[in-house]
Amino acid sequence: MTNREMKSRVMTLGNRLTARGQNRSAAFVRAWVIVKQGGLELAVKGVTFGNRQEALRRLATYDPSQVRAVLVPEPSNPADTEAVAVMVGVQNGRGLFCLGYVPRNMAAVVKAMGGKLPALRVVSGAWGRPNYGARVALAV
């Protein structure tokens, strides 16, 4: 990425974050960090709720190229009107399943980054923990 392209992406993301109500200075610092890193990787929250652990266990058996993730804003969510759900599905599957949510403090950033499809990574329990987790990566 050239210096000019990088500046353009920082300006675009920074202005989108500012439009979503973030402090202008903080928005541009956050945009610069995200663009320099080449994107953003976030842990999906709420993966231990309901039958989501069973869904993650099953997703872990698929090749990553067969799994697709979609980020869906949920303005009618009673707990958080800014919530962004992480919906997943498999190739030739029966629709999408809500795997969890983007962390509350990053929802505005994810919305500002636009409708890019994220990459999903299922991670198994670490340090002896039996639970599965998931991470989504968004490229700039």
Enumerate the predicted regions with their spans.
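Conserved active-site motif detector
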Residues: 9-20, 25, 29-140
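IQ-motif-like calmodulin-binding regions
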Residues: 4, 8
